[in-house]
């Protein structure tokens, strides 16, 4: 019996000795004894009141593994218009426990068309829902596995994996479409329908008689309008890529107790912090007289106020609020419209519709004006009432939305109901407008992207005093990076929108390209915005010159204005707030002079053949 007890005790002793040896080896491999000795010695000299709090906060937490991504959740939420969009939540493993970190929402890329047919609206609603649902599936089924275990601060690796994942999805979609096409080709096609021959071309215009007033040569040689380019293809689910990339960047900032814009600035400047941050200049919409407005005027989808660069963001927002208040008051006090003398079909006099305003999805009043001068005269009157000087305290910008104005049946832009102008005539219209109202310093999308020649002409005429900014005409960030050419249209800058598969690394690259070309970066909101305010951090972190947020009459847009104010206050407190430079057109003026010289040279080269054609026509 004693031998058995002795053997048992000997076995336990050997097991304990073995465990002790394993423990010693484990702790020595992790350098625990030395670190604990140093910790206890330093703690003794410090003698903190909360010993264990000091040990955890100032030592053990620093020795722990960095937080790593353990879960990504995609959800469908509603944006500011009640339409579905995507939200992404990030959770990380911190000291062996999963913990929720942050959430972001990303807007969809769809434009809001207020006067669309019900069939078109239903089709777009279906497309939108499919895009969001596919993104949610990608995130919950695949992307979490792709990014599991990565440290959020490793943005480059995160974006690389997201890009690879997206490329595989694009290839899968391509193969699926090819398979569907091959299956359709197996089905016998119906016999072709014989079409009647096309009508003969119209007779040439009569030749000018001697003494007749000479018309413009560009009218005689006017080119037919080019058809619109097919819309840029967007793969359903692509918004998952951009949303997850943004969510990881925000998670990295949250874990480091830094604001998001600081993390983004580090990405752009190779982990170095700028000494100062300049706030982007506000572009605040105050009026809308575009294609969807009930009045005759279509040219001004947005009339935008740009407060002076010498104002702080807080002063700029206060100025915009006061202008908007005055606009609302003006709409309430307008006299009733006069009746027209023209009679309708029933013989009664037809009354002009009242000038009333409603808040558009862009956050500003939609007003039915009938002339280009009306909204500008309204703002001039408001300036007089407030003791402000238009062109000094603030300037104006016009979002023309040229792609929405084109009437393809006539091949011209419909600037007002019943008033159509060719692309060449639009150049003259804009030049006359800027000559009459020099306080307008920016035109957004004055033409379609297909009218590159008119972009060049307008740039040559106005580059020294008015910014030409490409919004819808510039294409998506992904398309620009794919082409590696951001100067296809002659402009001063581009509007950048964070949508679809655009990652943080893509935004770093596109802003570097824009800065390298000495162009202006404008971060802009989409038509249908969510309540997420990350757009402001993107603009500040990546050093945008302007930020276009829409009007101050919708909650989802006011969250972004509030974020702008919070960032400015924080920068001032930290002593890193920088002044914004005044509007400078000198570089663009030199570029425009060179462009005009090239155009003049080209015109001189083409005079001889044109004269030959005219002489041959006379004979």
Curated annotation (Swiss-Prot):
GO MF assignments: magnesium ion binding; phosphopyruvate hydratase activity
One Pfam match: Enolase_C
SUPFAM superfamilies: Enolase C-terminal domain-like (SSF51604), Enolase N-terminal domain-like (SSF54826), Formin homology 2 domain (FH2 domain) (SSF101447)
Pathway: Carbohydrate degradation; glycolysis; pyruvate from D-glyceraldehyde 3-phosphate: step 4/5
GO cellular component: phosphopyruvate hydratase complex; sperm principal piece
Residues holding substrate: 302, 548
Disruption phenotype: Male mice are infertile and the sperm have significantly reduced motility, ATP levels, and enolase enzymatic activity as well as a structurally abnormal sperm fibrous sheath.
Basic and acidic residues bias locations: 173-184
UniProt-annotated catalytic positions: 497 (proton acceptor)
Reaction(s) catalysed by this chain's protein: (2R)-2-phosphoglycerate = phosphoenolpyruvate + H2O
Biased composition (Pro residues): 188-206
EC number(s) reported in the record: 4.2.1.11
Entry's Gene Ontology BP terms: cilium organization; flagellated sperm motility; glycolytic process
Family: Belongs to the enolase family.
Subunit structure: Interacts with ENO1. Isoform 1 and isoform 4 interact with AKAP4.
Name this protein carries in UniProt: Enolase 4
Organism: Mus musculus (Mouse)
Upper classification of the organism: Eukaryota, Metazoa, Chordata, Craniata, Vertebrata
């Amino acid at each position: 019996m004693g031998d058995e007890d002795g053997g048992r005790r000997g076995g336990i002793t050997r097991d304990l000795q073995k465990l002790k040896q394993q423990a010693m080896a484990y702790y020595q491999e992790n350098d625990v004894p030395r670190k604990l000795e140093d910790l206890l010695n330093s703690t003794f000299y410090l003698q903190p009141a909360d010993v264990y709090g000091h040990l955890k906060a100032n030592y053990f937490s620093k020795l722990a593994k960095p937080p790593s991504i353990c879960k990504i959740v995609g959800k469908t939420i509603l944006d500011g218009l009640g339409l579905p969009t995507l939200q992404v939540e990030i959770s990380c493993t911190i000291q062996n426990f999963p913990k929720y970190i942050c959430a972001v929402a990303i807007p969809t890329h769809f434009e809001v068309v207020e006067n669309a047919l019900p069939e078109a609206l239903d089709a777009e609603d279906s497309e939108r829902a499919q895009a969001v649902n596919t993104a949610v599936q990608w995130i919950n089924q695949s992307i979490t596995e792709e990014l599991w275990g990565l440290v959020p601060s490793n943005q480059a690796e995160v974006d690389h994996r997201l890009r690879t994942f997206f490329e595989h999805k694009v290839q899968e979609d391509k193969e699926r479409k090819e398979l569907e096409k091959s299956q359709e080709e197996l089905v016998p096609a119906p016999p072709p329908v014989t079409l009647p021959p096309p009508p003969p071309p119209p007779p040439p215009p009569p030749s000018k008689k001697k003494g007749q007033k000479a018309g413009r040569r560009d009218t005689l040689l006017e080119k037919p309008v080019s058809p619109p380019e097919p819309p840029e293809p967007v793969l359903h689910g692509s918004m998952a890529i951009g949303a997850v990339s943004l969510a990881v960047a925000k998670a990295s900032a949250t874990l480091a107790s830094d604001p998001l814009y600081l993390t983004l600035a580090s990405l752009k400047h190779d982990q170095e912090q700028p000494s100062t941050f300049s706030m982007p200049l506000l572009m605040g919409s105050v009026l809308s007289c575009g294609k969807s407005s009930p009045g005759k005027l279509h040219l001004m989808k947005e009339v935008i106020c740009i407060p002076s660069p010498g104002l702080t963001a807080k002063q700029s927002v206060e100025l915009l609020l006061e202008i908007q208040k005055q606009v609302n008051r003006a709409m309430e006090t307008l006299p009733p419209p006069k009746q027209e003398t023209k009679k309708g079909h029933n013989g009664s006099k037809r009354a002009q519709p009242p000038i009333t305003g409603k808040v558009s999805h862009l956050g500003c009043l939609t007003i039915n004006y009938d002339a280009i001068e009306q909204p500008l005269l309204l703002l001039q009157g408001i300036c007089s009432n407030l003791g402000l000087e238009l062109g000094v305290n603030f300037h104006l910008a016009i979002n023309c939305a040229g792609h929405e104005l084109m009437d393809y049946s006539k091949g011209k832009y419909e600037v007002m109901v019943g008033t159509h102008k060719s692309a060449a005539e639009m150049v003259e219209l804009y030049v006359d407008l800027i000559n009459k109202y020099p306080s307008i310093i920016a035109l957004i999308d004055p033409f379609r992207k297909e009218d590159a020649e008119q972009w060049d002409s307008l740039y040559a005429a106005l580059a020294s005093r008015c910014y030409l900014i490409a919004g819808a005409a510039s294409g998506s960030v992904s398309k620009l990076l794919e082409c590696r050419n951001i100067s296809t249209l002659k402009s001063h800058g581009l509007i950048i929108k964070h949508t679809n598969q655009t990652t943080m690394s893509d935004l770093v690259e596109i802003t570097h390209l824009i800065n390298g070309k000495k162009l202006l970066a404008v971060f802009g909101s989409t038509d249908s915005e969510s309540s997420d305010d990350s757009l402001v951090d993107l603009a500040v972190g990546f050093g945008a010159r302007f930020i276009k947020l829409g009007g101050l009459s919708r909650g989802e847009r006011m969250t972004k204005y509030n974020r702008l104010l919070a960032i400015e206050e924080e920068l001032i407190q930290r002593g890193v707030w920088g002044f914004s430079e005044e509007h400078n057109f000198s570089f663009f003026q030199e570029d425009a002079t060179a462009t005009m010289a090239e155009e003049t040279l080209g015109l001189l080269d083409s005079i001889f053949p044109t004269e030959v054609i005219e002489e041959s026509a006379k004979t």
